[in-house]
Amino acid sequence: MSLAKAKEIVSGNPVAVFSKTYCPFCVSVKDLLSKLGATFKAVELDSEKDGSEIQAALAEWTGQRTVPNVFIGRKHIGGCDATTALHREGKLLPLLTEAGAIAKTSTA
């Protein structure tokens, strides 16, 4: 059930961040996405009644037990380090745009 819920969240949003409210790495990722103007769904696992089950299901699905657990365009990206590395490499913005999390701007 929890895995199905996680997959539904991932498939229903251009960007999904499984997070915990007290996690500084989660805050960093959400701040970065916000600064880039990305639309994302944050699921605060410590506020969800089935949060620990969702986290366990995510670990089984992705092999990652920690938060944040970031998905862009239905693809597992990883955590804070992976997300910020993509940004440093100039690859995050194109991924977000391709996923539909950032509106494409017209140059006309």
Swiss-Prot record:
Disulphide bond pairs? C23-C26
What are the entry keywords?
Cytoplasm, Disulfide bond, Electron transport, Redox-active center, Transport
Q: Which domain of life is it from?
A: Eukaryota
Where does the record place the Glutaredoxin domain? 3-103
Q: May I ask which residue range the UniProt record assigns to the signal sequence?
A: none
Query: Which Pfam family, just one, is annotated for this protein?
Result: Glutaredoxin
Major localization class: cytoplasm
Q: Tell me, which GO biological process terms does this entry list?
A: cellular response to oxidative stress
Q: Note the NCBIfam families from the entry.
A: GRX_euk
Family assignment from sequence similarity: Belongs to the glutaredoxin family. CPYC subfamily.
Protein name, as recorded: Glutaredoxin
Q: Which organism is it from?
A: Solanum lycopersicum (Tomato)
